[in-house]
Amino acid sequence: VKNIAVAGMSCGGLQTLYNCADPRIKTLMICNSGLFNQSNAGSAVGGMPMPPKEKLNEIHSSILYMLGGESDIAYENGMDDFKRINHVPACATNLPVGHGGTYGQPHGGEYAIVALAWLDWQLKGDKKAAKMFKGDKCKLLERKDWTIEKNELFKKLK
């Protein structure tokens, strides 16, 4: 197996980041999640891995943050992670739906559309799927209420 994605939602996003250094991983998807700052780590779920923000330095693959906008309880943690990542291509997408995302909608709603495009691009090299994220006028911005931020390495992707 050569194309492995690791993804998680909420606490699962913390587990994804805990395992980010695995050399088999080709891409990461962090959904409605982000590492706690040391100042708020005490409010984390007991028994969950709680890596420090320095763990982000171990990421070696592309990474997508899919967040639920400012009303998402994980918004600040996820956006803080995104802003700290400058050594691999990273992007942060937001849809103002809160922490529950669109998972309860038929077929996963908008989140599923974006997640599948990411996976098709990152794991299969699908150029059409890449258009969802790449460029100043990426297809994501044509979808209702979505926003996207990209780090400098992401902006340079061909």
Which role does the model predict for each range below?
Residues 12-15, 78-81, 111-115:
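Stable alpha-helical elements in mature extracytoplasmic
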Residues 26-105:
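The feature captures the conserved acid-bearing segment of alpha/beta-hydrolase catalytic domains
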